[in-house]
Each structure stands twice: as structure tokens, then as C-alpha cells.
Amino acid sequence: LCDPDFADWPLGEPGVVADLQRWVRARSRMTLYAHTFDALAQRCGRWIAWRRQWSHAVDCRSDGELEAADYPSLCLVPGVISIRLLDPVLSRGIASYEAVDALACREAVDAVSQRSIEAFPVTTLGI
């Protein structure tokens, strides 16, 4: 998954968390790329709790040198589907099962992932 901030994603919805629970039991892995994870932390408590339990299967990464606009909004499940948001204002995008569209999404994610580092720790240590 990739998005500037995941503010418009329904990751905290009970149905989404239930689907992710079933999905992760198949020994799958998930990587999220974002400019900032603040909206996710504030709005998606269920997802945060789920991630705490499954942190070994979920990576959150960011590249502080990129601008928010450099992050595409997309979901890529290799070999299954690619979903790309083209216009967030009008909620318009493309869902595709075609390999060529998956490749375009992979290339967009690769551009972000190359210099990304781990971000959004599961727990924060304080003094």
C-alpha cells in the first residue's frame, strides 16, 4: 500500500481489519509507504491494535526526502490486483488484473521504496 498519509483509507473499519486478520494468517506480508502516518495513528485505532499483534508481518516505511505529492495512492497485490487512485477529490481510480498495470504500480512503489526507511514504530519508548 502506498499513499501520502492514508487519511482517506478505511483501514480502521471493522470489516477491513477482519479481512486483514484472515489475510495475514496465510503468512502474507504487508508494506505501507507514506510521507506521514499521523492520520493513520489518529483515525485507525483498530488497525493500530491489529498491527501491534502482527508487526512481524507489517512494515511501515517512509522517505523523509520525498514530498507528500511524490507518493502515489495505490494498492498492489502481486499476481492478483492493482488499484490506483487517480483523483482523490472525485474518488476516481483504476482497478486492474492486468500485468502491465501491476508493473506500472510496482515501478511507482519502487521509486518510493528505494530510499525508504522504517517508520511509524509499533511502540514508542519515552523517558
PLM regions with names:
Residues 33-78:
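HKD-type phospholipase D/PLD-like phosphodiesterase module
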Residues 29-30, 57, 118:
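A general structural signal for well-ordered secondary-structure junctions
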Residues 1-32:
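PLD-like (HKD) phosphodiesterase/transphosphatidyltransferase domain
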Residues 19-23, 50-51, 112:
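Hydrophobic helix-cap positions at the C-terminus of alpha-helices
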Residues 8-9, 40-41, 83-84, 91:
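Short catalytic/ligand-binding loop motif for oxyanion handling, primarily in non-cytosolic enzymes
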Residues 59-106:
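HKD (HxKxxxxD) catalytic microenvironment of the phospholipase D
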Residues 108-127:
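Charged phosphate-binding loop/patch that engages nucleotide di/tri-phosphates or the phosphate backbone
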Residues 13-16, 43, 105:
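Amphipathic coiled-coil/heptad-repeat helices and related helical stalk/stem segments
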